[in-house]
Amino acid sequence: MIYLLFVGLVAAAALSDMWSMRISNANVTVLAIFYLVLACMTQPQAAIISHVFLALSALVFCFVLFSANLIGGGDAKLFSVLILWFGVSDLVLTYLVLVGLIGGLITVIAITARQISWPEKVIRFMPVWITQRRAGIPYGVALGLAAIWLAPEIAILKPV
């Protein structure tokens, strides 16, 4: 049940980013609170502190990237809250590599799709990042897919 709730929340954020290039604050907040409640029931205080510290560090780093207009605010928040779930573990490096690979694939798809002259009837049903050359890339999709892929390995989600 806990695993499915995590995957559902992450999938909702990724799908929202894919279709509207927006990740709701409510979704990210629920993910953060969900982690903190679950962690308080199952994890030692030192582990919780290390997870929170790493997530706050990620948020500061992402804020710098956001300020430089390199990433979106929703991507920054989603990345930070997902790092909260991964914590200080070897899994973080795997997560970062997967995000890079999936994000690179999405970027290639976007660049390729933007070269196509889509019929007006089709454009109405497509995400803006596919049809508009100056649109950004919905990196929340890569962040979410990588997290869902690795969810079975996240320590706090494993059955006891």
Give a label for each model feature.
Residues M1-V160:
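A membrane-topology feature that recognizes alpha-helical transmembrane segments
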